[in-house]
């Protein structure tokens, strides 16, 4: 079962990283830190929980008490609390980009630069042949939003009907003349769209 775990960022084990360590190169939060001697040290207590059956990067999403793992090869797995990874791929997630997901009341949707794929029931399937080729997908108050890959436009579905993509249900973000490369829906149902220059 998926669950959030508080990470004690302000505890002593995390406080000994010098600020200069972050100025000496790129940094990101993982299961390691840079010591005062500028070496890497792994946090204690972390261990492998499950090895995925297929190689590649894995993107995790929580869905109805399970973890959903999507690999960079497009395979989708449902991971139960008993450490089993069941392949639920009928239609792979394609596009070759980082996988994004949106949760509706009944399904979870995936986009990665190709057609939008949904997991509803036991297997994945194509959301709609009319849906845009998208790198990002989001859900707000009964509407599914998706950017049109390589453009400044995004489309939305009819309310509550996620397979219905009317060609007139489109907006253009024209504050900057660049393609939309990000779509985020905040916990307050605000939609943020961004591109490389905006």
Language-model-detected regions and their locations in the chain:
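N-terminal beta-propeller domains
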Residues: 1-84, 133-198
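Short linear motifs in intrinsically disordered
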Residues: 57-59, 65-68, 98-100, 105-110
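Hydrophobic or amphipathic alpha-helical targeting/insertion segments
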Residues: 100-127
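Beta-propeller fold detector
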Residues: 86-91, 125-130, 165-169
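Short coil/turn segments at the loop-to-beta-strand junctions that recur within blades
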Residues: 55, 90-97, 130-134
């Amino acid at each position: 079962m998926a669950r959030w775990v508080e990470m004690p960022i302000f505890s002593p084990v995390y406080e000994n990283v010098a600020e200069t360590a972050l100025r000496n190169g790129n940094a990101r939060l993982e299961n390691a830190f840079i010591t005062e001697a500028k070496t890497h040290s792994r946090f204690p207590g972390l261990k492998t929980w499950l090895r995925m059956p297929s190689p590649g990067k894995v993107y995790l999403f929580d869905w109805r008490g399970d973890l959903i793992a999507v690999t960079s090869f497009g395979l989708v797995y449902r991971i139960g609390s008993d450490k089993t990874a069941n392949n639920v791929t009928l239609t792979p997630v394609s596009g070759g980009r980082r996988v994004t997901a949106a949760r509706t009341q009944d399904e979870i949707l995936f986009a990665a630069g190709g057609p939008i794929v949904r997991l509803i029931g036991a297997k994945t399937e194509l959301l709609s042949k009319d849906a845009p080729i998208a790198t990002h997908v989001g859900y707000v108050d009964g509407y599914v939003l998706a950017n049109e890959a390589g453009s400044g436009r995004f489309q939305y579905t009819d309310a509550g009907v996620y397979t219905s993509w009317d060609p007139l249900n489109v907006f253009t973000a024209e504050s900057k003349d660049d393609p939309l490369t990000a779509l985020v829906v905040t916990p307050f149902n605000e939609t943020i769209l961004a591109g490389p220059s905006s």
